[in-house]
Amino acid sequence: MSEKKLEKFQILGKKLEHQGRILDFYSYEMLVPNGNHTRWDVIEHKGAAAVVPVDQEGKIILVRQYRGAIDDFLLEIPAGGRDSTEEDFAVCAARELEEEIGYRCENLCHLVDYHSAAAYTSEKIGIYYAENLIPATQHLDENEFVQIERYTLPELVELIARGEITDGKTIAAIMAYKVLRGK
């Protein structure tokens, strides 16, 4: 069996359909390798950062918060969008750590990068872990409400296995932390 090399697709044009506060919705005109023209719906996003905060007892701090798109609460690691496409992912992760759970850290280490849904969005999430947490002041946005919860790594793996954690970035982060940190 011969392996055929994939050919690159070409973006011929982009039409802004909606500009939002957090994301922009585009219609891309594409030229595919067989010569056909097609349209793709694409959400362009500045990117985000997320952090696995590990407290002095080795517990991981998560937030439970409401997500309107699914009309339910999700258990997630602290995360948030970058202020611009130029903002360093680590700077964003450190900011979200303080804003959402009220901690700074001495050690912020990169775990993995994650494309949240590459079929239709450019969003890339830089995922970090934070150790040696230092108490600071929580700075939630005006319309942001979270409940802080702490779990051991085995408890989180069990919650993932039982389908009680369904947030993709959180699943990727916890499993990457488990594998890469040898826990």
Residue ranges and their predicted role:
Residues 6-8, 40, 50-95:
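Conserved Nudix-box catalytic region and its N-terminal flanking loop in Nudix hydrolases
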